[in-house]
């Protein structure tokens, strides 16, 4: 899909959202004035329901359609796409959770934009790749019900710890997914932690250089009580392997949209500038089409569950493509792009700078791939 087609797609199916994003993209990046409005705007456009089964309140479609939605939004505002990624990824967690009661309780408010969903699993994804330990610990405080009747045990815990960086912690109300290590042993769990649960503290917004309208903050839990009906999964490692392709696939949608917008912006330069970079633009456009197809196909078919390295390589390639496309936009824009208020070039440079560091960062992925290759060399299983 070309950049222009992507933008026209959002303009055609969600004109009010497209206009709002175009009018406020700079504000969403530079301050928190409109941070409370992003999720409701996305919900009003129906984007939170894309790829969600109709019987669960969605509009149907696939996870590939949800990736396209993130890309479409990113072409207008990377900050809004970052929020959409967080919200839609949390929704995906519920769709893939065995806890139907939790899904029934939270999904309606998430789909209509009343409640914000924060993924909170960057730490868990690093844990899955043996990069860092889990940062939240649960103590079992289960007690036998007074009835003493079979089935009267109600599992419950108190959790302590924190996460230094979570997006979409909307002040009007949020629920965050967090991986928790059990003091008693056994596989870690993933819980849905509500903003108003006892002991939950949201910090002030982090002092970011961009994406300041994304409600990004730290979250701390002190003796926060959780019950079985708050648990997304009781086996985080096995569940994360299955959900990671959607987590990363939706995240990669942000890169797709940013590349499309930067490439489209090269057409806004003068004839001489366009001619000078025409071959480069054509090459990057072909790369974008190929990577988009591979990404969506791999996520849809479940290929990345068993071969996560392929997805890691795609994520790295897309980050490199973001850099190359943003550089071309600067070249064709010339001095005009360095003047305030005349274009979105400077904002997209900041957005492009964020892509390599969002978890999992390129450094983490490259180290993971290097470790895997070293292990393959030792075992003679290099492919």
Tell where the protein language model's regions lie, with residue ranges.
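Generic structural signal for well-ordered, non-transmembrane alpha-helical segments
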Residues: 257, 282-289, 312, 316-323, ...
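Glycine-rich flavin
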Residues: 34-44, 48-160
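A short core secondary-structure module
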Residues: 162-200
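C-terminal helix-coil-helix/basic helical segment that borders enzyme active sites and/or dimer interfaces
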Residues: 22-30, 271, 289-323, 327-340
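Glycine-rich phosphate/cofactor-binding loops in nucleotide/flavin-utilizing enzymes
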Residues: 336-383
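A generic N-terminal leader/anchor concept
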Residues: 1-60
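Glycine-rich beta->alpha junctions and the first turn(s) of the following alpha-helix
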Residues: 206-289
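A generic local secondary-structure boundary/capping motif
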Residues: 105-108, 125-128, 135-137, 163-167, ...
């Amino acid at each position: 899909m070309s950049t222009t087609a992507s933008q026209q797609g959002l303009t055609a199916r969600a004109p009010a959202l497209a206009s709002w994003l175009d009018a406020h993209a700079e504000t969403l990046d530079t301050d928190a004035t409109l941070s409370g409005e992003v999720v409701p705007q996305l919900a009003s456009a129906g984007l939170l329901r894309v790829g969600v089964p109709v019987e669960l309140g969605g509009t149907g479609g696939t996870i590939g359609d949800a990736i396209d939605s993130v890309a479409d939004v990113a072409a207008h505002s990377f900050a809004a796409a970052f929020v959409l990624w967080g919200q839609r990824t949390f929704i995906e967690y519920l769709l893939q959770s065995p806890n139907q009661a939790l899904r029934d309780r939270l999904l309606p408010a998430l789909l209509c934009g009343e409640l914000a969903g924060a993924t909170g699993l960057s730490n868990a994804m690093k844990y899955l790749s043996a990069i860092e330990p889990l940062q939240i610990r649960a103590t079992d405080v289960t007690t036998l019900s007074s009835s003493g009747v079979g089935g009267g045990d109600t599992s419950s815990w108190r959790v302590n710890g924190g996460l230094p960086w979570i997006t979409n912690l909307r002040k009007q109300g949020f629920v965050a997914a967090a991986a928790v290590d059990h003091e008693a042993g056994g596989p870690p769990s993933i819980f849905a932690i509500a903003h108003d649960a006892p002991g939950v503290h949201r910090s002030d917004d982090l002092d970011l250089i961009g994406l300041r309208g994304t409600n990004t903050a730290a979250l701390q839990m002190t003796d926060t009580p959780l019950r079985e009906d708050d648990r997304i999964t009781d086996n985080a490692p096995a569940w994360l392997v299955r959900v990671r392709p959607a987590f990363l696939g939706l995240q990669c949608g942000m890169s797709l949209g940013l590349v499309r917008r930067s490439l489209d912006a090269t057409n806004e330069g003068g004839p001489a500038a366009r001619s000078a970079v025409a071959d480069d633009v054509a090459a990057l456009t072909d790369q974008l089409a190929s990577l988009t197809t591979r990404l969506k196909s791999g996520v849809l078919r479940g290929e990345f569950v068993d071969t996560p390295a392929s997805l890691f390589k795609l994520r790295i390639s897309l980050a490199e493509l973001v850099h190359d496309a943003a550089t071309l936009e600067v070249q064709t824009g010339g001095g005009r792009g360095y003047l305030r208020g005349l274009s979105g070039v400077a904002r997209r440079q900041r957005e492009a700078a964020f892509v390599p560091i969002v978890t999992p960062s390129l450094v983490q992925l490259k180290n993971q791939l290097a470790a895997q290759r070293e292990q393959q060399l030792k075992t003679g299983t290099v492919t």
